[in-house]
Amino acid sequence: MHKDRISGRAEGASAICTAKKRGLLAALCAMLLCSCSPVSRTPEPTTAAPYEDENTAGYEQLTEESAREQQRFSKLETSLFQDELSSARLDLHFLLKNPESRGITQTDAPIAPVSAEALRQTRKDQEDLRSELSSFQTALLTEDQKLTLRILESLMKTEAKSNGLELYSQPLAPTIGTQAQLPMLLCEYTFYTRQDVEDYLNIVEYLDTFYGQILSFEQEKAAAGLMMSDTSLDHVIESCKSYLLVPGNNFMIDSFKERLNTLPDLTDDARKELCARNEAALEEHFVPAYKLLIDGLEKLKGTGTNEKGMCGYPDGKAYYEYLVYTETGTSYHSIDELLDATEQEISDNLKITSKLLSDHPELESMLEDYHYRQTEPSAIMEELKEQTLQDFPQLPECSYTLKDVPKALELSLSPAFYLTSPIDDSSQNVIYINRNPIYDNQPLYNTIAHEGYPGHLYQTVWFHTHCDSDLRKILNFSGYSEGWAAYVEALSYELDNGLDPLLGELLSANSKATLGIHAYLDLAVNYLGWEQDDVQKYLSSYFSDPQSIAGSMFETMVDNPANYLSYFIGSLEIRNMRKTAEMQLGDAFNAKQFHTFLLDMGNAPFDVIQAYFTTWLMNQKMGN
């Protein structure tokens, strides 16, 4: 299954991840104070040299060669796109409403396989693709093709970091693992035709086979000394127990019946027969699949002896570095640079909060009881649509559905998540909201800004309706997508939303600092080797009772290495570009134009975006 089919917030947002036939994708679309005066900081330069293409051929020769090269690249794009989506029925269904229109008529498996062998084949295919990409003469391609080529080259360079480290892959995790997210995808498997129902039932019936593959992979990890700790295993097992459904009345049965109701011309007898088959598939395959995982993982207890973060494994530091770059697509050159930048961002934002509280002591009492103008999800979405018109380009009208996470799954899933629409039908957008009281401290207004307008839904629909490359539409770079959502979430505190403007500024700075603290701990635990005592000591600088949260924070970082970084580092990259543009353009800076540039770029690693940002900035200076 493609990574990041579900886009969500930082508490548990990202990955359903397995090998691909062609191995193209690291990620595919899928989801968190002291007393001194603020110091003005010039942002670190975040521009890269613009791309330059050299070609000395004559005009007639260039035109002929260009046509051939462009056609060759177009064929490669089509081939990659079709290969990726034909590898698994589940991915294909979520990404294309009408696959036949893209030349795809069959798939290799209900769900893409999970195994070390499949991952090794992925790496080999990626090396072959990397070699093929290097054969293109960039100067002869169209501008859009050049961008796609550069994105693919960057992606393949990052993926090469994981060569030989296949057994470090983590398909299971408490809230962002396959076992936690797959049921929600099944609940949203749209029935356009009767055949879709048959395909869905085949996937459910395949689930025990698929989870058997995952268990075999975990057993291979254990034999290699790479198994997760018993603490992490307990978290995953607890997640699995949420899906031991009660027969006859559960969310999987209810959602199936609701989707059947959307099918026209289905007789009552056919409906009853399909419902009976679904209940049988759940009882005979879905629940046994989770029991298989639970029993198998229980037997693996004691095989995982690493109680530290990722760096506690033999090559864990190298694998974590790969995770950092694949999750962020960052333009920073080293993890040490990321640590420094994260520390600086935390400090800058805490200085802002300190200055605000010092200059406006009344804000302290406001923090204890504040309210947004809108509190209902649909009203918040509509207000945000209006609020964003000033600084963001207008999105064509699109439909969306807001749903609550099933009560039985609240403890196993993120605070909220967005299910992306098919690339050929942007009308299907679903946002799930987790109503569990443990998330009451996360204001719904900002959560919906992250997931809806101007966050994931807005950015995804914009890209689907403005990008001509089908291949690019199925590539997802978490640093860009989650970075964008975290960036606009922070902005949402300062909209005209019913809050006192100074309070909004305070909450925005505090949210950025808090996310930064999580990101720093992610790096410190998984790269520097911090233990729980180190985490508690670090937290004591920011929280009055660090002992009460140090344990859970440490375990979260161990369970989900690099998860927080896509949110924080991605949003930091965007803020750095904005600060650079504001500094160099002065009064000529236009937020809507800056956001339009980023939206038009779409999903891409920041090392590529930076070079295009340099060109955009030069054009802005010249008034173009």
What residue spans do the PLM features occupy?
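Intrinsically disordered, low-complexity, compositionally biased regions/tails
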Residues: 8-12, 16, 27, 62, ...
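C-terminal motif of bacterial Sec signal peptides marking the signal peptidase cleavage site
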Residues: 32-35
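Residue-level recognition of conserved structural "scaffold" positions that shape functional pockets
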Residues: 15-19, 30, 577
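Intrinsically disordered, low-complexity repeat and linker tracts
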Residues: 1, 5-20, 38-57, 624
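N-terminal maturation segment of proteins
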Residues: 38, 48-624
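Sec-dependent signal peptide recognition
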Residues: 21-27
